[in-house]
């Protein structure tokens, strides 16, 4: 465990395996005055992200930086245990390729009569959002069939809110930037006017004001925050988009289960890019781990996932890591991992997705499962390790 100190706050990092870029991103966050009262905890799977660290948890009150949640609002996992013990894997692969749009693809028509986006405040392409329900997306999103030690099969789906999350996040981050820029300029203009009047230089006021309007806010654009009504609107939209992401995972699962003729025994969802609006805890690449709460932590496409139960540890912000965490960026992975090594690592797992285009998601680009298991003992109990028998990623 490490402690990192910034100008306004301190963060606990629950791992020693952290690179300099990630440390720099954490410290930059700690140097922002608006998070001086936040409780910040960084998860063991942490790594540098676009504008913020993946694996961040922090308490919030009346201000929040939308970038800290990011663009895939509500992204998470759905785990479904099915009654069947023997599955036709080629048929499953065909069903997924036929009925679950992946990559940038969406459904031609909505799969249901949806209305949950009617009250969304942020502008968004609602028609596209509804057609996206039941679609996987790309990147590290996946569909997997895993087996536990008792021979039970688990359908595991990892995806989020698709393009809708991007639209909402972008809207509020731009709004945050504009609000802070306007606030900064307003404060400076008041001070300059008073100063110039006191010095009898009123003729310089207009020119000085015009120059000030070109200034950037004192906070980096990627870390600008919303407050006031914009904060309330963001939290409101956050809840709606999180529901949208949950629906997306559920529709994918229901489609597969119906086409395969399976039967559901149990299911649960674990979200990892969101704000817990009840307890005001922001989680970016981390999950809720309250006392007795069931959760799933995916490791990689070879080693499967951990099914855990939370311990409700307040020092961890009642949180756990959302995965193993990358040790190679996508570009580094394509240079460091060969296709033969990738194929060898996936022996025994049925997948039509092991190819050059998915090397950046190969098992070798993530931290070892053993490291994550060791580091999470204080926040969860591991109940099961479920191992892949089938894996699908967009390709």
Regions from the PLM with identified roles:
Residues 2-28, 35-42, 48-54, 62-66, ...:
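Domain-length cofactor-binding catalytic modules of enzymes
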Residues 66-116:
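A generic, well-ordered mixed alpha/beta core segment in the N-terminal half of proteins
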Residues 44-45, 72:
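Acidic active-site catalytic centers that drive phospho-/nucleotidyl reactions
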Residues 57-59, 79-82, 308-309:
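Short beta-strand-to-turn element immediately C-terminal to the catalytic PLP-Schiff-base lysine
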